[in-house]
Amino acid sequence: DGEEGELVFTSLTKEALPIIRYRTRDLTRLLPPTSRSMRRMGRITGRSDDMLIIRGVNVFPSQIEELVLKMPALAPQYQLVVARDGHLDTLEVFGELRENTHTQDSIAALAGELQHCIKTYVGVTTKVTLTPPMGIERTLTGKARRVVDKRPKNT
């Protein structure tokens, strides 16, 4: 109870059939029991197949998104770039400013604050780069590509 994990359904009503578990790949947690006969689950926080492993730490894009959305100076657009430096994976977070009125010092302070929040909440050290409004490339539908994986495919 209360631990986050993958939501799995099992049908127990079928008779004379094998018990099959259905993986949803949705991450959620079971809420504490109430007087209801059925268990309740919390909101879905991400997908297990979205997980990145950076230096042994499980990183979900939804964790970074949550931190970006808490900063009023940043737009809800972000991009995670995963690369390999030697034998270690690195993560760079690109965020987008809401307004183009910031000084270089205030941009550096915002980037440092986001970097500290990511280190504290997620547990991985990242490089944070903040871009002007519309600085992150969009797809044809207007969405930013959330994860760019630049690691070599053969290793």
Locations of regions flagged by a protein language model:
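Active-site glycine/GP-rich loop and adjacent strand/helix microenvironment
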Residues: 1-155
